[in-house]
A protein has these predicted regions:
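Alpha-helical ds-nucleic-acid-binding substructure associated with the helix-hairpin-helix region
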Residues: 5-83, 136
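C-terminal accessory module of base-excision DNA glycosylases/AP lyases that mediates lesion recognition
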Residues: 87-162
Length: 162
């Protein structure tokens, strides 16, 4: 839910979601419709994505336990087959849920801006440049991403206070 929304907005949506559904799983999510999901703060696209994901799980076409045993690119390929889930979402799932050590979401705007600030660049690096810049951090790019996100958060808080 944090994609393209502020962390504060994501937290507020999550709190409203917790009040609207007692226990969330694929089947309970499928009892809701787009309108109810939008009522807890999800955009239309995110509501439809959540319903698509729930349907895949409910029908047995997506098994999160199996994802744990797949290679990173296999997980990305599996998740991005679901309408509304792109590479960034799959990469963040690999980082957060599967704790994979070498994921670098090169197209992440916060990472790009964090790297721009850390390296004192006059421009936001491209996705290709981000891959090249992160090459020395292999096989631990996830840790570099987490540190860069932390830097970005501190950087944006600092700018907001100025």
């Amino acid at each position: 839910m944090q994609q393209q929304v502020s962390l504060a907005s994501a937290a507020a949506i999550w709190q409203r979601r917790q009040k609207s559904v007692v226990r969330i799983n694929a089947d309970t999510l499928l009892t809701l419709n787009e309108e109810k999901l939008r009522g807890v703060g999800l955009s239309r696209a995110k509501a439809l994505c959540a319903l698509n994901l729930a349907e895949e799980v409910s029908k047995g076409r997506l098994n999160f336990r199996k994802l744990r045993h797949m290679e990173d690119e296999e997980v990305i390929a599996s998740l991005t087959q679901i309408k509304g889930i792109g590479r960034w979402t799959a990469e963040v799932y690999l980082i957060g849920a599967l704790q994979r050590p070498d994921i670098w979401p090169a197209a992440d705007v916060a990472l790009m801006e964090g790297i721009r600030d850390i390296l004192s660049l006059d421009y936001r690096p491209s996705k290709k440049e981000m891959f090249l810049l992160a090459r020395p951090w292999r096989p631990y790019r996830t840790f570099a991403a987490r540190l860069t996100w932390l830097h970005y958060r501190q950087m944006t808080n600092r700018n907001a206070e100025a």
